[in-house]
Amino acid sequence: MTSFLDQPVGQFLDQVAARSPAPGGGGATAMTAALAAGLVAMAARFSAAQLPDAEDLAARADQLRCRAAELVAEDAQAYGRVLDAFALPRDAEGVRDRLVREALERAAAVPHEMTEIAAQVAAMAARVAGAGNPNLRGDSVSAAILAAASARSAACLVDINVALGGLGGDLPARAAQAVAAADAAAQQATAT
């Protein structure tokens, strides 16, 4: 299969809309975070006169963009494992249940990472919106809002997968913290 990143945008959008399980909500969420990080990187590059660390901000945004983009495929793989595990016949030894649980743990971990990335991107976007090149403020504000939406969507996916698997742990709480941070950054970006 061709990487989602090697496809034209139109083809990726067609795949999202197709009657297939992936890319779905997780892939769209990761792509949204990647787009937000790209906007931060661009705005930072145009803000060298206003921000002494603009180059570092752009470099960090690029790292987050690349990682978020990788998560598009990782989410599709994780969801594929969930579907494969659910398709297994029930067995007395509980192998299917164990495989379903393991698959759902990974399916929750991927969007959790998305929440963390999105919160970082939103914070960076708010900083660039407030102190960067004023001509790029719209791009920075858009990045912050997109990142906050990505964090919220990813946190919902974490909650769904944790509930479906009856998983314990603190992933939902940590995802909710990332959403709160991303929302606060987006509000800061729009208020500056």
Where are these regions (language model features)?
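Residue-level recognition of alpha-helical structural elements
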Residues: 24, 28, 50-53, 57, ...
